[in-house]
């Protein structure tokens, strides 16, 4: 028997259509409900032969064919009553329909949505002030929570576009840190994943050398700046520096080398007799990527070009196998330095000659013309 009912329902579904109701179909449905009542809608399509499903037959009867239905637009009293009930009940359309004989829940919902969209387009509030005040008193009388009413009112006000901007937002500056934000960040431990500090300065730069950052970084609690008077401050002045509180990634504290643009390595000692202060000697590279070698001071008695020219002439004479003219100097200091340089080059020239492959050591020892050391001795340099 259950199988037969299932087959009948399946056969009925195949015959159902989603077409509009015709006047002849409305007449057949109305006569059937008046004769048999509106209790059972499952057998209506089968008994009447209508090509509509039971739900469609019921909806058609309840919203269009029922004799007690009230047709036409809502009156002023009905509209005011809808506003009062909606302010308290919200979107409970079935409960609201009980207060309106002849009006269905679907009709009340359509009326409310159409009115709300119309007022929203004009920028007017959905609830009048007197309706809202009366709804609050009614809610308090029947024990309805006022918070629920305020929620409905604020929601409809937002949908109507009646939102005013607070005055406090007009005076709010960009990137402004509140005291609560600063006090909260002050207790946060610095992260170990920071690559660079917002403020990077180095000592021995003749003042404060820092990387200017965005002013918004002033709210960063990890930046700590201190001013200390270093030894021999008359050479460098006040130096401002900041050290990172925690190691950086891969135990690298800084990715940049210090700059010594303003420091003169050839500066004479001060008149007070103090030893010349070399900042390179006090730098202790620790866990850095590149370590700079120490740079010593070169003597300033002769220019560096003098040694370059002398070395070029000596190398040219060894390679070509002939001795060129060597400039003579009159000063005693120059001759002494020149003699010491020649002695140092006499030890290095045989190796250079052998590596070049032009002049052999045996040929240089047997030939008197190539004995340039003896010629130098004859000239009186040594």
UniProtKB/Swiss-Prot annotation:
Q: Where is the HTH myb-type domain?
A: 13-69, 70-120
A single Pfam family it belongs to is Myb_DNA-binding
Q: Which GO terms describe its molecular function?
A: DNA binding; DNA-binding transcription factor activity
Q: Which InterPro entries match?
A: Homeodomain-like_sf, Myb_dom, SANT/Myb
Q: Where in the cell is it found?
A: Nucleus
Q: Which cysteine pairs make disulfide bonds?
A: none
Region: Disordered, residue numbers: 326-364
Query: Which CDD domains does the record match to this protein?
Result: SANT (cd00167)
Extent of Polar residues compositional bias: 329-343, 352-364
Keywords associated with the record = DNA-binding, Nucleus, Repeat, Transcription, Transcription regulation
UniProt-listed GO biological process terms = regulation of DNA-templated transcription
- The entry's DNA-binding region: 41-65, 93-116
What SUPFAM superfamilies would the database entry show? Answer: Homeodomain-like
Provide GO CC annotations from the record: nucleus
Predominant location of this chain? nucleus
Q: What is this protein called?
A: Transcription factor MYB104
Q: Which gene encodes it?
A: MYB104
